[in-house]
Amino acid sequence: MPLPDFHVSEPFTLGIELEMQVVNPPGYDLSQDSSMLIDAVKNKITAGEVKHDITESMLELATDVCRDINQAAGQFSAMQKVVLQAAADHHLEICGGGTHPFQKWQRQEVCDNERYQRTLENFGYLIQQATVFGQHVHVGCASGDDAIYLLHGLSRFVPHFIALSAASPYMQGTDTRFASSRPNIFSAFPDNGPMPWVSNWQQFEALFRCLSYTTMIDSIKDLHWDIRPSPHFGTVEVRVMDTPLTLSHAVNMAGLIQATAHWLLTERPFKHQEKDYLLYKFNRFQACRYGLAGVITDPHTGDRRPLTEDTLRLLEKIAPSANKIGASSAIEALHRQVVSGLNEAQLMRDFVADGGSLIGLVKKHCEIWAGD
């Protein structure tokens, strides 16, 4: 399929996707019943969409195009009520978190969808292992060239986004020692990590043509980069966050990305170059492994900075932009989180350290989601 022209969007508009866990009490393992839930709610959703993701234990909640985080929060809240009621009717529960702490990937059923079945044929067991749960945020752009500039700008802050959203310390019944273990699942995929370097939209079109020669790429949706342009929506999509445990934190993360995008495209503070990515995977690893306690390294100067310190600097820089787009509440909440030094991964570990089981942890996450 050829790459579509870049659809012009109103700059800084938002679209948010949350991949949720469908679990089966009282054992709180992943259920394989997302199709049943989708059928139950599809005629009751008035704004946004509830749909499949890769496997039958995943349920995606997606907003429509939103002006600001308040509109997005309203759509999510309405969807949440409908989904929770349908889940209760079918003796299921819903929760966030980037991984389910003890599910077995071999049990996961890939959705009966042409695209996902084709992906299963291409990637085999890797697709079942990709039963992990992330938050994706789309930001509208006025042109393809703006999208490429924004993608490179946001890529500088991938460690910050990962650390602030880290919520996947447990996997396959084990403490991984990572704050966010979810991104590691994709390391075996050929399109893992950052997009190959291009400097404008014309070069991106040439890149996509080259990738399509592999026959593994049918559309932009088949590319799973950390951040990717989405020409059919006219957006840049940030894909590195774990699904938070609460709607409020998900909305705050979206506000952070929207405000950062506004600052980047309004101020144009960077002259991007390929060398910017020289230490990308090392800095990304620091955020995945240590969360806000990680240390990032400047590829141009060699300077090393605590991620906590650099995140506070980012929040300060984007505060005026956040004020202009109605996202100040998100920046203030994230500032409090950074100062406290906590993320959801640490709260999960604290629960287990206090004697909680992994089954009890999932139950707690369901209670948190339902109560938010």
UniProtKB/Swiss-Prot annotation:
It catalyses: L-cysteine + L-glutamate + ATP = gamma-L-glutamyl-L-cysteine + ADP + phosphate + H(+). One of its GO terms (molecular function) is ATP binding. Its EC number is 6.3.2.2. Pfam families: GCS2. GO terms for biological process: modified amino acid biosynthetic process. InterPro entries: GCL_type2/YbdK_subfam, GCS2, Gln_synth/guanido_kin_cat_dom, YbdK. The keyword Secreted does not apply. It is an enzyme of class 6 (ligase). ATP-dependent carboxylate-amine ligase which exhibits weak glutamate--cysteine ligase activity. HAMAP family: Glu_cys_ligase_2. This is Putative glutamate--cysteine ligase 2. It comes from Escherichia coli (strain SMS-3-5 / SECEC).
